């Protein structure tokens, strides 16, 4: 028996025979060539074919999932048609005399490396995978490689090194019990599509999909995060019981839809969702979120050549507001900086970006960018219940500056007779400074949201990107809990509510403590809402 551990993309337990899918590896070597024009034309032809394929895949995805999720393929097409990508390929061929396949590979890697370094933002980090997928698509067309997943009639466990979004959207869920990959992550476009299709999946197992595993019995435990090849009888019978229990528990969780989130003694706490896109809002609604506690707006600024125009931002915010109405949507303003580089940001590289010009500091340096976002949010507020959340606050003067810009934006919109709502204004409490002056800050705004990920990093003086300091990243640390409690007390003294939106919001070990100290709301991934509601309803 072989056991491997991985990341659970879509929870479930599957038992069945393995189907190995191995792709033909493209030949990538830096061979020099003399037929430069032929190589360039070959690239252009392959690029045109890739555009055609992506258009077809978008149409297929619209039928199988949704228009919003089909945008994944539009994003890939946009990357493919990125002038920087084409210019990089041209330089590799025309200036460095490399063959077309290597030129595409090199151009893709160079662009991917920009995003691959953004370890503190999983969403941005995963865009490196998109560039590599796009480059790989063109290379496979250049080399006439056409691997197809041939699924048998009887459902199987698909095991492969990796799957692209195109391969996932091509799967027939009725023939796939689950899939397992050697590589992968929770935030990739592949993972997003997988969750939409409802296919049980485990990724990043680090075990190669070898031909000798084909046809063997396997167990995918995408609840406990384990993959078993050729399990023994005891494990198999145990996992069959676990599978039955899991299916029963899923039905049990469905009973939590529509019920109130309160303890046995009647204490109530709000339960909202964290989202990063319009698609996520629909998932939040399906999981009966009481609202959106954190809408990360960064996705609008990624994979593009310039700042998103006001109309595009307005459309996204409006869409989420309408999906969730009358429930609230809290939009966090741009939390981006020197650690999340796009060429158009024009920010200087910083030695320690976590302590640099990020979030509100970035916006203070680029007020027009900030005002554009605020105009879009205020316009969208006419279509739902919207709140605005400002990140990385450390001083009263920053909040005063924010309000001055808000007044300018409101005056501009009023002058143009553009209808708006009245968004509530909130602050992220994610620095020790903000927590320590939360009594003063509470006098200025309508609500707080505690970002425990950064609060932990800054309070414990431990860079969360430094793997050697992982043991210090302890949100249960007494100092963190004390700052949280202080913030709650100061907020309630001024009659404003407090939410927690960091990772520990979903930590069931701390749920009772949060309720005890008076936290008003927890904002968690949509997939955690029903489980957490059930847990809260079991507490005294």
Spell out what each predicted region is.
Residues 48-66, 78-85, 91-98, 109, ...:
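Generic secondary-structure signature for well-ordered alpha-helical cores
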Residues 1-28, 143, 150-155, 159-287:
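Acidic, glycine-rich flexible loop/linker segments
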């Amino acid at each position: 028996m072989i056991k491997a551990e991985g990341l659970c993309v879509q929870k479930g337990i599957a038992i069945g025979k393995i189907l190995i899918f191995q792709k033909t590896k493209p030949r990538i070597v830096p061979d020099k060539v003399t037929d430069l024009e032929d190589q360039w034309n070959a690239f252009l032809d392959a690029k045109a074919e890739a555009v055609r394929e992506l258009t077809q895949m978008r149409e297929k995805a619209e039928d199988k999932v949704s228009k919003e999720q089909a945008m994944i393929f539009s994003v890939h097409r946009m990357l493919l048609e990125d002038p920087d990508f084409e210019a990089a390929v041209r330089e590799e061929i025309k200036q460095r005399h490399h063959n077309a396949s290597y030129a595409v590979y090199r151009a893709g890697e160079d662009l991917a490396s920009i995003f691959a370094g953004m370890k503190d933002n999983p969403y941005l980090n995963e865009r490196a995978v998109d560039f590599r997928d796009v480059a790989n698509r063109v290379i496979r067309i250049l080399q006439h490689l056409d691997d197809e997943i041939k699924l048998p009639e009887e459902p199987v466990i698909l095991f492969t090194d990796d799957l692209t979004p195109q391969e996932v959207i091509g799967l027939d869920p009725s023939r796939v019990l689950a899939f397992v990959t050697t590589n992968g992550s929770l935030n990739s476009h592949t993972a997003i599509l997988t969750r939409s299709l409802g296919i049980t999946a485990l990724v990043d197992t680090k075990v190669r999909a070898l031909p000798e595993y084909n046809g063997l019995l396997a167990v995918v435990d995408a609840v406990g995060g384990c993959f078993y090849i050729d399990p023994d009888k005891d494990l198999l019978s145990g996992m069959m019981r676990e599978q039955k229990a899991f299916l029963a528990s899923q039905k049990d969780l469905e009973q939590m839809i529509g019920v109130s989130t309160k303890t046995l003694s009647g204490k109530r706490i709000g339960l909202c969702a964290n989202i990063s896109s319009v698609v996520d809002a629909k998932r939040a609604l399906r999981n009966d979120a009481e609202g959106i506690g954190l809408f990360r707006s960064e996705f609008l600024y990624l994979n593009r050549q310039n700042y998103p125009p006001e109309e595009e931002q307005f459309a996204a915010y409006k869409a989420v507001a309408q999906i969730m109405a009358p429930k609230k949507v809290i939009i966090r303003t741009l939390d981006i900086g020197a650690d999340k580089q796009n060429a158009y940001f024009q920010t200087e590289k910083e030695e320690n970006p976590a302590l640099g010009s990020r979030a509100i500091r970035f916006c203070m340096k680029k007020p027009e960018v900030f005002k554009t976002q605020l105009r879009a949010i205020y316009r969208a507020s006419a279509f739902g219940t919207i709140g605005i959340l400002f990140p990385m606050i450390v001083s009263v003067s920053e909040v005063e500056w924010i309000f001055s810009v808000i007044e300018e934006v409101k005056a501009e919109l009023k002058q143009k007779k553009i209808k708006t709502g009245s968004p509530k204004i909130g602050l992220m409490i994610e620095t020790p400074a903000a927590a320590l002056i939360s009594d003063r800050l509470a006098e200025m705004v309508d609500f707080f949201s505690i970002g425990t990920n950064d609060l932990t990093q800054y309070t414990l003086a431990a860079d969360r990107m430094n793997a050697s300091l992982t043991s210090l990243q302890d949100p249960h640390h007494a100092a963190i809990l004390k700052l949280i409690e202080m913030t709650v007390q100061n907020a309630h003294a001024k009659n404003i509510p407090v939410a927690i939106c960091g990772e520990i919001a979903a930590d069931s070990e701390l749920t009772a403590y949060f309720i005890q100290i008076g936290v008003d709301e927890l904002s968690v991934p949509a997939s955690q809402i029903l489980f957490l509601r059930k847990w809260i309803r079991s507490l005294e």
